[in-house]
Amino acid sequence: MAFNFNWSPLMADAGFYTRAQELLTAALNKSPKPPIIVGDITVTELNLGSIPPELEILEIGDLADDRFRGIFKMSYSGDAYLTLKTCVQANSLNTYMVTRPKFTSPCPLAADHGLTIPLQITLSDIKLSGFVVLVFSKQKGITLVFRNDPLESLKVSSTFDSIPFVRDYLQRTIEGQLRLLFMDELPAIIHRLSLRLWVPELRGQDTEVKADEEAGPGQDPLLSPPQDPVDASGNVLSVAQIASLSLDSGVEMHSLFSQRNLVRLATLTDSQRTLSLFTPTIHDVVFRALTGAMEQSESHGGLISPASPPLSRTHSHVASLHSLQESSMSKSSLGSPLSGCGLTMGAGRHPRTRPSRKHKRRVVDLRKPQKLDDTSSTCTDSEYTVSTDASTVFSSSARVGEKPDDPITPPVSPDATIKVKDRSRVPAMQGLGPSVTNKAGQSTPSAEAEKITLSNGEPSYIPHQNTPTIEAHEKGDDNTISLNGVPPSMLSFVAVSQDRSILEQAWMMKLANEISRRIQEGKGPGSVGSNYCGRRDPSPPPAYGQ
């Protein structure tokens, strides 16, 4: 069985070539393009040539007036050609960087910048050979499917034919793209073309598309002026002004809005954020459609707690400040700022605060009970004696004038004076408080140092500001020394014993008389003795401005 192909009508129909170029352009840009092609591929020329393909019938499955199905062997070696235009990337390093992941590719500074060059490619000398399944129907068009890869060879001519490696690269790349085109895209292109030729409904759609293209784009509704146009300042424009604007340029017509619309937009702007055009105007009133969480946080200063209201946190903060002020005035209220801070920080979690505990001070008296009687005296011109109760010195119930187990006996030295270094000892003893007591009979390093000073007989002096007065007073058989306000540095060597010798008692009397005489000499306004004896309740200073 032989077939005669009438190939000349395809050469004469210009509309067929136009539709074929559009379909080929869409097909070439649809498939994934190689990275070297950076622009769209456009089919500029398409010519099927004058030599038709050769068909050999292998099988006919269905044959009727309106349908046909058969398997053919097709071979084509004609003069058809195809011309494409696109843009390619001339810098191969740029292509390499695009196709590689960033963490494995180098980071050149300027060597990978792109260089785009226009490219024109012409495909000619196309040779095809393969098995084709052809199905024809007037209602469904023509379906052409290749059972194998039909492309044998083709010639690629481009702008870079003078560069061998570019020419070879384009040859390989285009051959691969054409193989995909013949296997996937060409059957769909042929089917769409056949539908436009034989199906009348699709012919009507093509006619409507052509009519729309001839009509041109629609008119912009904004170019037609409104009924009451105004300018940007709100001034009403006349017909002559509108005509002059339209003659100058059509762009400024977009800025002409209706005065009524401008009034409604201004009302919407002043509508108290309620999106209502008719919100009543009330002074000192802010309208809100909904109170959000952000506005609640702004009204309460940003203190939001799901467990407690913001007002409780505010009051607790004030309480903590008040407690901090009280703590600077009294040491006993030391726990109040801590409790106030805890109330402030954890008001939502711990509604109750723990009361501050008072520190218990336990005093253990390990000394032996004394048999001395407390005596008292007052300040006189020659001498003064006070009770031996040491509570004025140590602020406790511990006794000072007691019998030591190992009494300290200084040597007899009538010319020696006592050098007292109580500047470093008094703060230490005052800081320890009543919780620290020395055992009876123990000698401290300071006492031994003072004993060595007395035994050497070195002359010393007693400063008026830091040296208290000591006086020995004999009553009956026992010799006692009355102390009042004596610093702890003097207590280390003023221990009284009943077994002292007469010489030692005489030395103590002379020492007491010397101290009393110096006190009497230094007595006066601003002196140490007068301040020590009479400064019990000092009068407050006069007020400012008097």
UniProtKB/Swiss-Prot annotation:
Keywords: Lipid transport, Lipid-binding, Membrane, Mitochondrion, Mitochondrion outer membrane, Transmembrane, Transmembrane beta strand, Transport. GO terms for cellular component: ERMES complex. It is a multi-pass membrane protein. Its main location: mitochondrion. It is found in: Mitochondrion outer membrane. It comes from the Eukaryota. Residues 363-374 have a biased composition (Basic and acidic residues). Transmembrane segments: none annotated. Residues 1-195 form the SMP-LTD domain. Lacks alpha-helical transmembrane segments, suggesting that it resides in the membrane via beta-sheet conformations similar to those predicted for other outer membrane proteins and porin. The SMP-LTD domain is a barrel-like domain that can bind various types of glycerophospholipids in its interior and mediate their transfer between two adjacent bilayers. HAMAP family: Mdm34. This is Mitochondrial distribution and morphology protein 34. The keyword Protein transport does not apply. InterPro entries: Mdm34, SMP_LBD. The gene is MDM34. Residues 208-230, 299-319, 344-382, 395-416, 517-546 are annotated as: Disordered. Belongs to the MDM34 family. Component of the ERMES/MDM complex, which serves as a molecular tether to connect the endoplasmic reticulum (ER) and mitochondria. Components of this complex are involved in the control of mitochondrial shape and protein biogenesis, and function in nonvesicular lipid trafficking between the ER and mitochondria. MDM34 is required for the interaction of the ER-resident membrane protein MMM1 and the outer mitochondrial membrane-resident beta-barrel protein MDM10. GO terms for molecular function: lipid binding. The keyword Nucleotide-binding does not apply.
